């Protein structure tokens, strides 16, 4: 039987609520929204840039440029789902940012970003973005699932799953480390896996 859905903490704020708070005249919710926006989407941008061949430093620069660009446009930005998914809009922003950085590098040379597209731009570009997006969804799902068990005083259940499934420790090794029996490890694996799938599906439905 599936466990009860967690009460949505700040980490699970919907994209719509984040966009709404970004336009708030109150600095407190606006700053919170920017932090949530950064924590949610910066890893996607960084992962995509790295998959395109950027170094860590280059990828971080792409992130900063994209976030700053969105910040500048936010007062005028109105997201219309009828015009396409936000993930597509964000990918376009990232692509334009990387293109602009390459152009600036070719003119002045201070930023070595000409290697940002080592991978063939015609091959698997959309798939690279999808991989980065799915990675972000899974990361958030893991965080939310961990919070779910922690709030219920069952963090050990999640830790058993984490050691056994995410970190690759055997069931006996996990049991010994956490001071539980092997059967409890297997039970935790089943329950947390089910919960994780549930949370991930919710996030996928929300993000589109």
Task: Spell out what each predicted region is.
Residues 1-208:
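Intrinsic, short, N-terminal disordered tails of RNA polymerase sigma-factor systems
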């Amino acid at each position: 039987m599936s466990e009860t859905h967690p009460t949505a903490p700040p980490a699970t704020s919907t994209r719509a609520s984040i966009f709404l708070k970004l336009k708030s005249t109150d600095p407190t919710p606006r700053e919170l929204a920017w932090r949530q926006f950064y924590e949610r989407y910066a890893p996607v941008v960084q992962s995509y840039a790295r998959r395109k061949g950027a170094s860590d430093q280059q990828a971080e620069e792409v992130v900063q440029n994209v976030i700053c660009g969105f910040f500048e446009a936010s007062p005028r930005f109105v997201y219309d789902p009828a015009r396409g998914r936000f993930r597509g809009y964000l990918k376009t922003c990232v692509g334009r940012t990387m293109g602009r950085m390459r152009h600036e590098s070719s003119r002045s040379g201070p930023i070595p970003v000409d290697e940002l597209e080592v991978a063939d731009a015609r091959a698997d570009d959309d798939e690279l973005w999808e991989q980065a997006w799915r990675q972000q969804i899974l990361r958030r799902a893991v965080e939310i699932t961990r919070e779910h068990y922690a709030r219920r005083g069952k963090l050990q259940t999640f830790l058993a799953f984490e050691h056994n499934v995410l970190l690759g420790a055997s069931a006996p090794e996990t049991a010994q480390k956490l001071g539980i029996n092997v059967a409890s490890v297997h039970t935790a694996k089943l329950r947390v896996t089910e919960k994780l799938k549930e949370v991930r599906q919710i996030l996928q439905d929300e993000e589109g």
